[in-house]
Amino acid sequence: MSSYTAAPLKFPRSLRIIKSADYGVLVHTRNENTFRLTSKYFSINAMKFPEEPGRLRFGITVGKRNAHRSVDRALVKRTLREAARKQAPNLAALLGEQGVGLDVSLRLRVPLKEIPGIDQGVNALKLSLRTDARSLMEALLKRFPKQLAQTRGE
């Protein structure tokens, strides 16, 4: 047996949006501090908080309309959590430099049955979801400094 112990892959409570009221504000507010990003399968609603520098929280929702079975919803949530967890350190560093906080809502925007790979087995589906989630999080990371520059009038 190897003595190697993997670091726990956690998504701590401090990184999560917990209250439904916070989700409501994030999804329904439209102003200069909010923006949206979409990919093939997922969408992001994000809101900047200039008064809370360095704060980063993620909320993940997968509706029954898009993924009927609970096992499928859990798979999509795990995939989104993994993508968010991997980009969180980079995004948190960027937020710290820029002096703002950010709340991000991630959600599945298309029915799972429309995703290529659903009929080829769970591994193909996981690959499709993982690839799209990763590209969406990278787009968030790339776009965020541009959003700040536009807000500040630079």
Q: Whereabouts are the PLM-identified features?
A:
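Positively charged, solvent-exposed patches that mediate nucleic-acid binding
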Residues: 1-154
